[in-house]
Amino acid sequence: MKIINPYTEILTPLDGQAILQHIELCGRVCYKSEDKITDTSAAKFVAGIIKRGHEAVLEHFDITVKFVCDRGVSHEIVRHRMASYCQESTRYCNYSKDVFGSEITVIRPSFLTEGTPGWQYWKVACRMAEKSYFELLDWGCTPQEARAVLPTCLKTEVMMTANLREWRHFFKLRTAPAAHPQMREVAIPLLHQMRSQVPVIFDDIEEATHETV
């Protein structure tokens, strides 16, 4: 059994200025104000439409992100219906195969400290689940049948593609203090990364949500 930390990877090449210019070009059609486009007008225009709540314009650019997280967190991610997803399938992935190292991979729980009794109980439970999974496969079960005993903390990979408007909605929900701690564990660093690469778009998301997990 392998234990790893969750992480994200932005797969879409991001040029912040080019993104703002693209959004401005689309948005100015509404007002037929294309003549006001300059080399420096995009940031002000985009900030203005966000302030006015005209966020439909932000739907003209998509970003794809790869999430490596546990199955429980993935269930929260895919609730965002205005997005497209591909996810590692426990129906077809047979973790007894060499390609998976003949072991399951689980996500380290952020709420448990390594070496404590809670950590040890969790680790034993995961190993028992792995053992039961392999025994079911040996007995003749298919991966989609044997997966019934796999833990919620099983590592999964999710590809999420969403437009900028939906990413704003995602971050407002998933970085909030009320969000699940393991959801915040991946969402907050991702928000920081997007803010650093795409100016203006995420600047108004409350600073209180940026606390370190």
Question: What is the role of each PLM region?
Answer:
Residues 1-213:
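Family-specific signature for flavin-dependent thymidylate synthase
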